[in-house]
Amino acid sequence: MSEAGTPAEALTYEQAIANLRQTADTGDRYYAAWWLGRFRMKQPEAIALLIEALDDSLDRAPDGGYPLRRNAARALGKLESPEAIAPLIACLQCEDYYVREAATQSLGELQATVAVPALLKLLEGGPEAIAAIPGKPHLTQPADAVMETLGQLRATVAVPVVQAFLEHPIDKIRLAAARSLYQLTGDDHYAERVVQGLSDPKLQRRRSALMDLGAIGYLPAAPQIAQTLAENSLKLISLKGLLDTHLRQQTPEAIAELDESAIALMDLMDGLL
């Protein structure tokens, strides 16, 4: 919310720029960075100010982190600007875990293959180095985000590094490794490991598996997705991810006709509405 309590849509581009430029109110700056990304404001001025915000040291969280840097990093991933890639790579060395995580995800959105060496550095030491930190809600590195981004970037050089994380003691790390390896190798064996998450006793893990399968577009998982004990809204999102991936792989003529797989997917989606 802005200072006046107006909804997001009521903030203008000019107000967002002014709020991000000033330094007296950190809350307004934080919100402005989010707003610029949320509404895809790709003007050079907005991008330049968001890049500048990646070095902000005025807005500090109780945990010592940098909230404005986090929002700026997230926003830049949505703005399709190559200028943001080098500054985001630099953010991978920030002491704030959440800045590293946001930068990692944005580099994936930007398809920044040049970031692969820096991303691999975050996984140095293997599974043993990615561990819990006493008193913190996160691990030493955002390994799940790193592996997912490596998968997005089709960084096949990362395969042996990521394979080691299939044996990590934390479920979400193993799931991220399997998702990444399917994207990197196309081997169904890895996708089936993600499918197993649909029957996990914990709802959050089932939700994660749904989102992962939608992201990788693993078509054989469609029936299991539809039957998963989770919200229909999430199952629909996952199935739409499968359908989108399937259609991208078809010729325009095939899309016009709709093959059996596409029709079956749409039938499953109709059943969830």
From Swiss-Prot:
Claim: Mitochondrion is one of the keywords in the record: no
Gene Ontology MF term list: lyase activity; oxidoreductase activity
Matches recorded under SMART domains: EZ_HEAT
Pfam families: HEAT_2, HEAT_PBS
Gene that produces this protein: cpcE
Keyword Ribosomal protein: no
Job description of the protein: Required for the chromophorylation of the cpcA gene product.
Quaternary structure note: CpcE and CpcF associate to form a lyase.
Protein name (record): Phycocyanobilin lyase subunit alpha
Keywords annotated in UniProt: Antenna complex, Lyase, Phycobilisome
Gene3D superfamilies documented for this protein: Leucine-rich Repeat Variant (1.25.10.10)
GO cellular component entries: phycobilisome
Known EC number: 4.-.-.-
Similarity comment text for this entry: Belongs to the CpcE/RpcE/PecE family.
